[in-house]
């Protein structure tokens, strides 16, 4: 797992192109998609999940209405790629917990579908 808050880390480890950040902003579906693809390639894994968002609380960079914004991207063997935007309620820790739950739930759903195909 890689946690990359700073744009330079998203570029270096998530293999996000700087032009994507410049065009779409650091918190965006496009950046999250590139991170999922980049981490998958970097680790040669079957599944990668990336998250990107604003857990909160508001600060000088983000307003309170942006708190709880979350983008999640999943890359399953390069066959299924999904990116979704969520608006989660609650404080910072609650938003983070919910983000983890949603990400892992989607991963589990994919794995169950793959197991059904194998049987």
Named regions from a protein language model:
Residues 1-119:
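Short alpha-helical segments enriched in small residues
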């Amino acid at each position: 797992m890689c946690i990359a808050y700073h744009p330079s880390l998203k570029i270096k480890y998530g293999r996000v192109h700087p032009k994507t950040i410049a065009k779409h902003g650091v918190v965006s579906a496009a950046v999250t998609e590139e991170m999922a693809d980049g981490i998958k390639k970097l680790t040669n894994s079957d599944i990668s999940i990336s998250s990107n968002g604003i857990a909160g609380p508001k600060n000088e960079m983000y307003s309170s209405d942006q708190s709880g914004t979350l983008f999640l991207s999943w890359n399953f063997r390069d066959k299924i790629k999904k990116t979704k935007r969520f608006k989660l309620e609650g404080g910072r820790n609650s938003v983070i917990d919910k983000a983890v739950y949603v990400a892992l739930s989607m991963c589990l759903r994919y794995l169950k579908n793959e197991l059904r195909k194998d049987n």
